[in-house]
Amino acid sequence: MEHLLHYVWKHKLFPLKVLQTTNGLPVEVIDPGLQNPNAGPDFFNAKLKIDGALWVGNIEIHTHSSDWFRHGHHSDKTYDSVILHVVSEADTEITRSNGEQIPQLLLTCPEKVQLHYHELCVADQYPACHPILASLPKLTIHSWLTALQTERLEQKAQLITQRLKHCNSNWEDAFFITLARNFGFGLNGDAFETWAGLLPFRAMDKHRNDLFQIEAFFYGLAGLLEETFLKREQEDEYSLRLCKEFRYLQRKFEIGQGMDATLWRFLRLRPENFPHIRLAQLAYLYQKGDKLFSRLLEAETLADVRTLLDARTSPYWENHYLFGRPSSQKEKTMGERSKDLIIINTVVPFLYTYGLHKTDERMCERAGRFLEELKAESNHIIRSWSDAGLPVVSAADSQALIQLQKEYCDKRKCLYCRFGYEYLKHT
């Protein structure tokens, strides 16, 4: 019930009758204040009139008055700034740390709001607010999706900043590790990130002009050249040469063992997405030129970015998906849709993060422009919103809706969602 009271207070969904304190003094809410997501009073800098006198301060909200004492606020000076205690049941008087009494307001949640909130909580169909989506004003939809898109980019920027710290502020290394993770396309994302974290970048830089040696580094540290794993597939001349080369590189650069190859997942994967193929494409990207991220910073169009991400394989993989198992001849290039997913999940967040770190608004704007120009992703989340009547055109739209599901819908945070707000107040 308390979270509903927060909602009612924030949006001033008060009953038509005059508000009064529990002592009968009239209350006029001029400004409910700014909601506080952290520790401390629930709303900051509210502006009220109590019995005609202007008060400016903080608001605390509880279901019962006695929760004030149960939470220890009566002895916490942080809460001495509270000017009004809002409750749904007033079962006791409350005081500040100096014993001074604090006014209380008995506030009930409107029945209509309670009913609609219950509907959202028990809805089987996703999204729960689907009955009203098609009728929402375009401005409401656009403004919320724009905010969600920024929220998602900010969230990704925080993760990239953490990775950057682990990489000693080396943007190229951090970019490649993130690129590798997203080459897993979901199912093998964790495995690719584990693998990329083992890569000795400075050692590999010394052999960047030799694709075979880069492949030896890559497959060796991926655990795919281990004898037990190779025998599960089939050894052939190429895999044995790679294995021999990796052992040499291990000794030369004092490199540790590769990862556990059982972390790689193959079940229900299309052969084009097998780890062997994606590793070969990453090796091609790594070998064809250094400072990939720096070159992406100079790419002003999506066409330029796609060219830089043109990933192929060495000749061996044109007729193999696994070691020692020949297949029909087929060039293993990365499809345009896969490239676009890499741009959405790797390039765009890095451009945005770089712009934030360097105070380069141009980079942040370019990141947003790329999302607007790219087509929307196609997955079950996006299809659900589209089926509910929400227009999904660009990757900016789809990224916003993914953020909406993961951070609001899945967590049942309808009270913090603008679509949820529209649902609760509809007639």
Give each language-model segment a name.
Residues 1-6:
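N-terminal "leader" segments that precede or initiate the main folded domain
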Residues 7-66, 79:
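N-terminal ordered "arm"
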Residues 30-32, 41-46, 66-71, 89-92, ...:
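Short alpha-helical segments and helix-capping/turn motifs at coil-helix boundaries
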Residues 44, 54-55, 60, 66-94, ...:
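N-terminal accessory interaction module
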Residues 65-67, 90-92, 111-113, 185, ...:
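Short loop/turn segments at secondary-structure transitions that flank enzyme active sites
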Residues 82, 86-144:
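Compact, glycine/acidic-enriched structural inserts
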Residues 148-400, 413:
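Hydrophobic, aromatic-lined core segments that form the binding pocket/scaffold
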Residues 399-427:
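Cysteine-cluster motifs in flexible loop/terminal segments that predominantly coordinate metals
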